[in-house]
Curated annotation (Swiss-Prot):
One of its GO terms (cellular component) is ribonucleoprotein complex. GO terms for molecular function: structural constituent of ribosome; tRNA binding. The gene is rpsJ. InterPro entries: Ribosomal_uS10, Ribosomal_uS10_dom, Ribosomal_uS10_dom_sf. This is Small ribosomal subunit protein uS10. Keywords: Ribonucleoprotein, Ribosomal protein. It comes from Ehrlichia ruminantium (strain Welgevonden). It comes from the Bacteria. The keyword Ribonucleoprotein applies. The keyword Transcription does not apply. Involved in the binding of tRNA to the ribosomes. GO terms for biological process: translation. Part of the 30S ribosomal subunit.
Length: 111
């Protein structure tokens, strides 16, 4: 039997850091239960986008309102993932506020 191993990078993005950490923890626990070696979660710097808007529609330039969006990011690396680990991760249910990008690299034959 030929076992194909792949390197998988899972990038998580969310506006809520609590939701993001909970999702990362569930991915890591699922991967470890399946027998994978896990690197991470690797924390990326928080991105803050600030928007400054005039409160008034016409005059009063001094009266402004500030809004910001904070984007949190985490990276989880699975150096040697096989098909059982991938199936376990596919069946995982994550919250709606978390954006997940999966990058699969390689496919070397061991065995």
């Amino acid at each position: 039997m030929v076992m194909v191993t792949q390197k998988i990078y899972i990038e998580l993005k969310a506006f809520d850091s609590y939701l993001l950490d909970r999702s990362a923890r569930s991915i890591i626990l699922t991967a470890k239960r399946s027998g994978a070696r896990v690197n991470g979660p690797i924390f990326f710097p928080r991105r803050v986008a600030k928007f400054i808007v005039n409160r008034s529609t016409h005059v009063d330039k001094k009266s402004r309102e500030q809004f910001e969006i904070r984007t949190h990011k985490r990276l989880i690396s699975l150096p040697k993932a096989n098909s059982t680990i991938i199936q376990a991760l596919m069946s995982l249910q994550l919250p709606a506020g978390v954006d997940v990008k999966v990058k699969v690299i390689g496919g070397s034959n061991n065995g």
